[in-house]
């Protein structure tokens, strides 16, 4: 069994340890979770995080990169992008994790270090980048592209043919109509219905979703 560490000791990492990894192990495609690494000043040697040891700061992985792989469990897209890209450039291997009940259709691709939560569905001919998070019960339509390090929260639906950029944060229960383009670094607030393209770096909110310049 391959050995794994989670980078990030917050709620995201603890969810992955508690729900996704046990299911993968039951299927025989899992990992031995060695522990958690996190740069937080509150952690010290000997600390346990929901039953798993805190191993050290993120540079810990550099000394063990030939023996273990890593999954970045940091929710913020931009922070995750900086960390995962830096570690990949240094030869760290990143594992993709898939939860119970998730379905990934044939001819779809998932990049390294992505996390697919339970009951999420990815339709045919989709391209999902590196370090992407698809939370519980997300629905991805056919021929969708999702850029690296984008995070999509529970219950969101992305219709066929949409192109989602890199480092995009999409809240829960969002719906994006077919064929829309969401620019890099955009943020879509929870519950929004997106009928139009969204420019890079902007924040949209509501039904129909409109730009909120005051929040940018």
What are the roles of these predicted feature ranges?
Residues 2-21:
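Glycine-rich adenosine-cofactor-binding loop
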Residues 3-4, 32-34, 67-70:
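Short active-site oxyanion
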Residues 6-7, 37, 73:
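Short hydrophobic segments within beta-strands
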Residues 12, 42, 210:
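Conserved Rossmann-like nucleotide-cofactor binding loop
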Residues 20-24, 87:
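Active-site catalytic pocket residues across diverse enzymes, especially alpha/beta-hydrolases
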Residues 23-46:
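NAD(P)-binding Rossmann-fold cofactor-contacting core
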Residues 41-103:
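Phosphate-bearing ligand-interacting subdomains
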Residues 96-212:
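Structural signal for interior beta-strand "rungs" in well-ordered beta-sheet cores
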